[in-house]
Regions:
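A ubiquitous short alpha-helical element
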Residues: 28-29, 113-116
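Non-catalytic amphipathic alpha-helical adaptor/oligomerization segments
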Residues: 75, 105-110
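Functionally engaged cysteine thiol sites
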Residues: 91, 110-114, 135
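TPR/TPR-like (Sel1-like) alpha-helical repeat modules
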Residues: 116-138
Length: 138
């Protein structure tokens, strides 16, 4: 009986790995509906706005793990890290968000803020100059 459990667990792990390797998210693998993800995001955002950063971080982390293609989740987690003064971690997350957002330079701007707060003025300036060069006045 244990052998069958191990084989089926190995098969499930293999199927999940194949799905993720082909671009599926854990949200897709587990069949989590988008409206549930939207509800979790609403809670995360509410916690963020209330200054309940630990709770917001927990929700945003879950959202990022289950749907790593959604830049809103990554931006949310990065913003939480920025407010918690985890500036390097925030910069790393903003970099991920920027790759997902392509031509949206908000993550670069927020990275510049983090660089300033880490007393890295030259890097901050590079970020702000890039934002200035690549965005149009709206």
């Amino acid at each position: 009986m244990d052998y069958q459990n191990n084989v089926s667990e190995e098969r499930v792990a293999e199927m999940i790995w194949d799905a993720v390797s082909e671009g599926a998210t854990l949200k897709d693998v587990h069949g989590i509906p988008q409206d549930m993800m939207d509800g979790l995001y609403a809670h995360a955002y509410e916690f963020y706005n209330q200054g309940r950063l630990d709770e917001a971080e927990t929700f945003f982390r879950f959202l990022c793990i289950y749907d790593f293609y959604n830049p809103d989740y990554t931006m949310g987690l990065a913003a939480v890290c920025q407010l918690k003064k985890q500036f390097q971690k925030a910069c790393d997350l903003y970099a991920v968000a920027f790759t997902l957002l392509k031509n949206d330079y908000r993550p670069v701007f927020f990275t510049g803020q983090c660089q300033l707060l880490m007393r890295k003025a030259a890097k901050a300036r590079q970020c702000f100059e890039l934002v200035n060069e690549r965005t149009e006045d709206e």
